[in-house]
């Protein structure tokens, strides 16, 4: 199969989405979105057929089932790589079911990385394994709803892990230990204060290691935004309204440091995280297909920045994430239960002298041992020590002062 498609690879990868050639037996498969010219989103059966075709055609690709939704739809993880690598990027696509552009961008990215024979793709996959959850909320996607079939916002479930979707993502992060987590979303604009083609934001949570935080900002400011702007898309910081004349920030409406959002949890778990949001509404009067293509193509432009970052800043990312994973074993420093990198914490939001650990009752341990395990938190029976890689996460799960705690453990101060 690969020898037959070699002649069309470069053109398929370089062409804009609208110009991908018509499907033929010897060309890469196309999504339902592409087949329709942007008139409709890819259906679940089309997605499954598309992924199966890519998997069969490329030995770079493997697909595994990482969970099942309440309505019995598969949660899948796609791995793209040519060999084992020390660096991993995870794309999480459409946690909100009514935000489809990220899913479409992820599907075409899977194909392009699977089929790509250009030097840039080969170089990327030599150093970096790319993991993709192409539809993180299949039930919500089928119903065109933000939440899953129970109405739960998956992107507010990365502490409690009550949903099958949240649990599957937690297990992937625990087991694969990605160095970068890239979370694709969409937003509704508020002209003229909040209306860019793309917004993005790094982990603001103050428990993020400084070097990981710095790399996440570098990913945003020096790679993702310039890549999008080079293709003609406007960019900005998610959650910040700005004056349309001066560009000065005038109001924050989202993007705080709460740990239950994947963007922040990624930082707490020592990965370089970034949220990306494409604007749903068009800036000018255009047809729905044309606007839908803009939504998806802006995401694809930003992804070019992510992959450039992975290649050019890989060594620095490896150093930052590795050091952050080791730092918790020193068991020093405060833990923050509030505040953000742009919102200094109140004294009550800082645990200046954290306990050695937390003791759980037998009933508490029985009730929450699965969630602790999915997070990757190390336990000693019913005792949960702070001296471990995920040191800062332990109080966020078990301390009475943490706003989204799982349960309240008994602090152990006898160190």
Label for each model-derived stretch:
Residues 25-75:
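Short glycine- and acidic-rich boundary segments immediately preceding or forming the N-terminal edge
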Residues 26-42, 89-92, 96-100, 124, ...:
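Intrinsic-disorder/low-complexity accessory segments
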Residues 73, 82-88:
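Proline/glycine-enriched tight loop/beta-turn segments at coil->beta junctions
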């Amino acid at each position: 199969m690969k020898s037959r498609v070699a002649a069309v690879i470069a053109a398929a990868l370089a062409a804009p989405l609208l110009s991908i050639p018509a499907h033929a037996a010897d060309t890469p498969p196309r999504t339902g979105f592409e087949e329709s010219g942007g008139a409709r989103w890819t259906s679940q059966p089309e997605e499954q057929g598309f992924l199966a075709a890519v998997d069969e055609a490329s030995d770079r690709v493997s697909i595994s089932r990482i969970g099942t939704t309440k309505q019995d739809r598969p949660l899948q993880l796609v791995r793209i790589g040519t060999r084992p690598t020390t660096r991993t990027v995870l794309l999480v696509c459409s946690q909100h079911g009514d935000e489809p552009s990220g899913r479409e961008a992820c599907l075409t990215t899977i194909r392009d990385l699977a089929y790509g024979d250009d030097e840039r793709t080969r170089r990327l996959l030599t150093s970096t394994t790319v993991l993709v959850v192409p539809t993180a909320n299949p039930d919500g996607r089928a119903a065109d709803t933000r939440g899953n079939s129970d109405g739960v916002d998956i992107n507010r479930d990365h502490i409690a892990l009550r949903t099958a979707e949240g649990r599957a993502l937690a297990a992937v992060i625990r087991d694969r230990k990605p160095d970068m987590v890239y979370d694709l979303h969409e937003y509704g604009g508020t002209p003229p204060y909040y209306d860019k083609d793309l917004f993005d934001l790094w982990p603001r949570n103050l428990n993020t290691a400084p070097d990981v935080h710095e790399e996440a900002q570098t990913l945003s400011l020096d790679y993702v935004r310039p890549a999008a702007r080079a293709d003609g898309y406007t960019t900005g910081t998610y959650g910040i309204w700005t004056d349309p004349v001066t560009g000065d920030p005038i109001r924050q409406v989202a993007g705080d440091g709460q740990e239950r959002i994947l963007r922040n949890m990624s930082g707490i778990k020592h990965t370089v995280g970034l949220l990306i949001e494409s604007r749903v509404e068009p800036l000018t009067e255009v047809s729905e297909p044309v606007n839908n293509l803009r939504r998806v193509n802006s995401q694809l432009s930003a992804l070019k920045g992510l992959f450039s970052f992975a290649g050019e800043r890989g060594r620095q990312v490896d150093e930052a994430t590795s050091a952050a994973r080791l730092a918790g074993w020193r068991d020093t420093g405060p833990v923050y239960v509030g505040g953000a990198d742009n919102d200094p914490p109140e004294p009550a939001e800082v645990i200046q002298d954290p306990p050695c650990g937390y003791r759980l009752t037998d009933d508490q341990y029985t009730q929450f041992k699965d969630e602790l395990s999915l997070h990757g938190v190390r336990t000693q029976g019913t005792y949960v020590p702070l001296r471990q890689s995920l040191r800062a996460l332990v109080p966020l799960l078990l301390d009475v002062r943490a706003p989204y705690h799982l349960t309240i453990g008994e602090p152990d101060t006898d160190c």
